[in-house]
């Protein structure tokens, strides 16, 4: 099974939105048994929390339900378990590489990339909408 992890800072805005969008795409393609999708944050200060209410509302307008998702921090094991880790911005990439246990070859499996490498028409980084109201634009970028 191919494993894909979306990562942002707190795992309450961008990465849960990306997780829900990708899960819908995987389900629509009938590939639920081939592709596993999850999300996490580079910081743990929202660990166990629901996504931000504004993310929930934005996703709902697009037919997605984020209410069952819970924030979790990136773990060392993620680098061994996931095939691809897609970060929302350059700071997330840097934080991920700081968390990767480089001395242990088991944790070298995951490839870390910025999500917008796959959609360069949107620039380099998906902005964090937490401090401003860019939730619809962020949804569009990720989708």
Predicted features and spans:
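Helix N-cap/beta->alpha junction signal
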Residues: 15, 89-90
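Generic ordered-secondary-structure signal
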Residues: 2-5, 26-27, 69, 79, ...
């Amino acid at each position: 099974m191919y494993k894909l992890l979306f990562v942002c800072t707190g795992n309450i805005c961008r990465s849960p939105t990306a997780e829900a969008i990708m899960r819908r795409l995987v389900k629509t393609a009938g590939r639920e048994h081939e592709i596993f999708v999850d999300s996490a944050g580079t910081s743990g200060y929202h660990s166990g929390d629901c996504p931000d209410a504004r993310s929930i509302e934005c996703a709902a307008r697009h037919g997605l339900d984020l209410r069952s998702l819970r924030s979790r921090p990136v773990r060392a094991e993620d680098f061994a378990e996931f095939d691809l880790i897609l970060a929302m911005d350059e700071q997330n990439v840097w934080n991920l590489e700081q968390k990767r246990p480089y001395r242990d070859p088991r944790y070298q499996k995951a490839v870390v990339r910025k999500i917008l490498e796959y959609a360069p028409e949107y620039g380099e980084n998906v902005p964090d909408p937490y401090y401003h109201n860019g939730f619809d634009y962020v949804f569009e970028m990720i989708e």
